[in-house]
């Protein structure tokens, strides 16, 4: 089953290549392939046994030197689902906006889908690193070639170099682990007895790599630039899935393999996370570019997840996982709403927008609902995630958790301010009225809206399968 998930997007690549120069057929083949992959992931979810403690759907395949193993547990399952859910949204959202090299654009996304799924299913630390780094190549091309503005090359190189340099420390840590333990197999490493002193050194190597990807202050510079310059599909996949790689890496490797060091460095993580939350929230209030507002909002939300991941409580870790999934749905939706405006008015500057409810009522309702989700109102997925995250984190460090909770208040402040500024008031004198969202744009937003409320109203659909896997991580 898992091998089918990995192969289906690659079959889509072959289909796109065989479609010749027929761009309409290329898009249909890519969309069909991505939807089929999503259906396979739903089958995976349906067949997952929540009462089984361990990896499921385990498969092995031979390599040059050994047998490599893939499998999913309650943690990785939902990241696979998120990936296969977001990729069709990316393709549909860029259906009309991408005008050049369409074939290679679609190929880049299908290859990226395979790499992302591989990150979440491989049970080998070295393979995780290889796929973790391989993601940089298609993302570099997606930002650099199909970016929206003149600084796209600069943004692509900044994204590439920041993440590559950070990951070099993880590579060194992996080499040390291999010589120490004699294996990079995840289950062997999870049972290995590594001295606390060695754990601390190795943990810092992983931390520097993942801190760039979260991103934490001061490693965040690349993210707003990448979001602003990327195409809509690039922003969707970046916010929807790529920012989750660090959280998954912390949970799967830093906490599981290096538990003593994780406990020792928890105050450091909490301190940097709280600084990042407060800094990014105040910075969001100062932005005038709509995409930058959503980008800095992402920095705050992703750092909230770290409070739960390092809380050493089931409630906190599960809350962080739900919050990551929620952010992977809500943030892409907000980017879609912003780009809908940009496609009509060709500006993202906030000062030009006012009174959009008068001639874009459907857009206004959608933007309102996703803004409520972003500020974590009850019944939204973000509410479940943030409530559980802060409840778990409070048990670990009450003072820093209360400071971090300021991010929720500031999130509500800039969310309500942003919606009020764009939707209400007299019609802007700078912009002529344009049409409301079309059918394609509506169809990209509805699945995201459905999933946001599904997780908020029925969280146990997601919490129950991950419970045993999370319980195994408690120190």
Where are these regions (language model features)?
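Structural signature of hydrophobic alpha-helical transmembrane segments
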Residues: 1-8, 72-83, 126-138, 199-210, ...
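Juxtamembrane/interfacial segments at transmembrane-helix boundaries in multi-pass membrane proteins
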Residues: 49-67, 152-154, 168-228, 250-268, ...
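Acidic, glycine-rich loop-and-beta core segments that form the ion-binding/anion-interacting portion
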Residues: 224-226, 230-234, 242-328
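Transmembrane helix-loop-helix hairpins at membrane boundaries of multipass inner-membrane proteins
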Residues: 1, 11, 15-107, 471
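Predominantly late transmembrane helices and immediately cytosolic-facing juxtamembrane segments
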Residues: 331-334, 395, 402-433
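C-terminal ends of transmembrane helices
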Residues: 14-23, 87-99, 141-151, 214-228, ...
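Alpha-helical multi-pass transmembrane bundles of energy-transducing inner-membrane proteins
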Residues: 21-24, 54, 107-198, 283-348
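Alpha-helical transmembrane segments of multipass membrane proteins
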Residues: 13-17, 88-92, 114-118, 141-145, ...
